[in-house]
Amino acid sequence: MFSAETYKQRRAELARRIGNGLILISGNTLSPFNYPNNTYSFRQDSTFLYYFGLNIPSLMAVLDAESGEAILFGDDFTVEDIIWTGPQPRLVELGAQVGVSNCQPLKALDGVVATAMKQNRRIHFLPPYRGESKIELSRLLGLPLSALYPHKSVDLMFAVAEMREVKSAEEIEALERAFQLGYAMHTTAMKMCKAGVVEREIAGAMEGIAKSQGLGVSFPSIVSQHGETLHNLNSDGVLENGRLLLVDGGAESLENYCSDHTRTYQIGRASCRERVFSRV
């Protein structure tokens, strides 16, 4: 997480670019793996992280593009929650970490959105990609699920993209850390690239590096001798001399910045022809 001032400056610039209406930014929720209390590893929405910095599930935020005021919505952990999670900071404490003083319960978001809609103010939102987010936006805005994409804010899409494509010095440092993790993953894969090794052994070693020094892989690693198949996630092949191994993998740094490297490695001794191509 960066300083509170960083997030305040980002929100102020976003409000300036949009200029009118309310900007609704949805955080992600926990998603069940195979039953409600067993969830996938949590990954916060990247736009929420960029403007509000909190890597915690079930948060929502509104930014008034006219006044510049930001409101953070969420619920404090209950006693039942704390049994499982241990003591957690209150919402107002989380808000202070990212420069937001107006923190309200999640249910208060309904009233804020309803009031804005009665005033015919535009509600800007990005096209959602998770089912849970689609359902919540549909409920909040009174739109059928099929109408969410047509009602997306193109202005907001361009504003967010234009801001995020220019990286600050502290972001570049975070990207460098993600790059170094990716480098360690790929050099490990290169050293393991020997006949008889199972592809998943290499994939597992790479994931272990990403998890031990960062937040894990930035996407499911592709480790396959069948590089002709795009996004081949099957890693059950046994490495054979003379074959080529495609390795597409990257890591997510502790600051949620990601690397993505793709390399092809020779299994066994390279032929003269292969050595020529490797120098190109």
Task: State what each model feature region is.
Residues M1-S278:
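Active-site neighborhoods and metal-handling regions in enzymes and metal-associated proteins
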